[in-house]
Amino acid sequence: MLRRHGLFWLKTCPRLNVLLNQSIPIPHLLHSRDICQQRWYAKGKRRNQISKKELKPLNFSIPNYISVNKLANLLNCRVERLIKDLTALGFENITTTYILSKEYVELILQEYNFALPNLSTSTNLDNVYDELKSPVNPKLLTKRAPVVTIMGHVDHGKTTIIDYLRKSSVVAQEHGGITQHIGAFQITAPKSGKKITFLDTPGHAAFLKMRERGANITDIIVLVVSVEDSLMPQTLEAIKHAKNSGNEMIIAITKIDRIPQPKEREKKIEKVINDLIVQGIPVEKIGGDVQVIPISAKTGENMDLLEESIVLLSEVMDIRAENSPKTIAEGWIIESQVKKQVGNVATVLVKKGTLQKGKILICGNTFCKIKNLIDDKGIPILKATPSYATEVLGWKDVPHVGDEVIQVKSEAIAKKFISKRQDLIEVQKNSSIVEKLNEERALAKEQHLNKELEHENTVQEHEQNTGPKLINYIIKCDVSGSAEAVSESISSLGNDEVRCNVISSSVGIPTESDLKMAQITESTILCFNLGNLPSEVINNRAGIKIKQYNVIYKLIEDVTETLTENLKPIFEKKIVSTVDVRETFDFRLKKKIIRIAGCKVNNGVIKKNSLVQVVRGPNEDVIFDGKISTLKHNKDDVAEVSKGHECGITFESGFEGFKPGDKILVYENVRVPRYL
């Protein structure tokens, strides 16, 4: 880890070793300048001498990256001295071409007693937009609707619950009866009349990241558990994420209508509750505060109790947010896609403030001047307040699902901060390149110092770097959440011999750029939930394979089959005939004596150019393994000889070491089926 981050010298720091033993995360250590400096100033005597001197002015700008020899020129010192000092400070494999990052340069300048006007800030991709946010104003806090996430195992009835509450056919619109991406809806609860926003997170394991994201932006989690199946793998996974999120939880035991007998139903419900207790869920039965409600979304039984429980729990939680139009609006991207005749669209769940037409939003590497707001029924609305999910039109590019949305005053400010974020991305990218370059140079130096082993090392390195065969794919989906889920699903497929390699993953039908990239990288394009593709895409000139799917199981199955076909073949010998060597005789051909094996076929058929093994003795020791050169019957060349007939045989490679009593085994190399 230390080498990967380029902090070679950190591992010599005693304090760092103590912290590592305490299991403090490496990223925290890497950003701690105090820890770094402690190693640099460990030699107290020298440090005390330097501190007494007056700081020297810095007359040059600190670059993001600089080689050791160029830094020596800027410092006006001998490069040998700088390398010696760096080595003393713990750097390894330092050469004149070793590249230093800006952070290291700043520490070196401090060591050389230079005055630094501006040290690198701790701004990173996670907090680059934090200064755009406004502090919470308690006076503006008003009650808002709870955001409820329904989680659970696939086909345990999550979408059916929302279908009941919305009185619409959500289930019928989904391929295979399984929700394919997050939907966000605000409803008026049938009994209380209170507003509730639901996030319907998919139950398929492929959508793990989307479900995690749902848990992080919700207030209440409704965990659905089928009374027939009890806790399943994805149920346990949902429990884990719910615990980590710290959200309040309600358990809904579903499909009770399938068990009409009261005693049997009660027994099944009791089993589910006991299983929940084993998983550490503090249900009311043992004095906890987690409600367990048996329901049937199909018949409506106890659905009013579920709705009432959500409303009452939200009132106890006293959920509030700033609802003033003057408050800087914030939210989360729940879904994003490209719609025909509309363009880039993103569903935003409002966290605070109010979204209105004309406001400027920033998100990731894109921004938006709101052209229109559309509710979940497809109706344009004037504004969206906290806990409301709305489609926002007007994005320059498709934002990523899960990214935070922040309101800004102008497009100029949005562009300024996006540029700042892109610079950080570029620095991060360059940092990886620099680390790799330094490691390659260090390796080259080591190989140069060990010339006698250079060839062996090169061969070993080639074998190690060859790695598994990569099957390239480009993923195109209807929405970004599905694109991410498909990418995650197939990226994990494969083994040490063959693996999936996702070249790119994006939203919309395949473009000309996608086709060119597929041609260059020899990729197959996987389209998910895109409907009918244009004929010019399917019948593209480059002959790129384009496969279309509506259900993720089928996509994963096809990719797995392709990987299986690309596994290295394994063959086993299958004996198809046995032949006895009865005698040997010599035959003169063009002044050359050729020894021929006089044989009789015991079973099967021997063919010209057959693969054979000549074996000898009771243990059938192999004395020859190769092909037949000639096959004769009554002095005539023949293509094959069948059981019971005699023949004369010569072998390739000039093998003549056979003798009477030997046995010839005729075999075929049969490919053994392999599976991932």
Curated annotation (Swiss-Prot):
UniProt GO MF annotations: GTP binding; GTPase activity; translation initiation factor activity; tRNA binding
Gene3D superfamilies xref list: P-loop containing nucleotide triphosphate hydrolases, Translation factors, Translation initiation factor IF- 2, domain 3
One cellular component term from this protein's GO annotations in UniProt: cytoplasm
Chain positions covered by the region annotation G5: 296-298
Record keywords: GTP-binding, Initiation factor, Mitochondrion, Nucleotide-binding, Protein biosynthesis, Transit peptide
Additional observations: Present with 1400 molecules/cell in log phase SD medium.
Name this polypeptide is given: Translation initiation factor IF-2, mitochondrial
Source organism (scientific name): Saccharomyces cerevisiae (strain ATCC 204508 / S288c) (Baker's yeast)
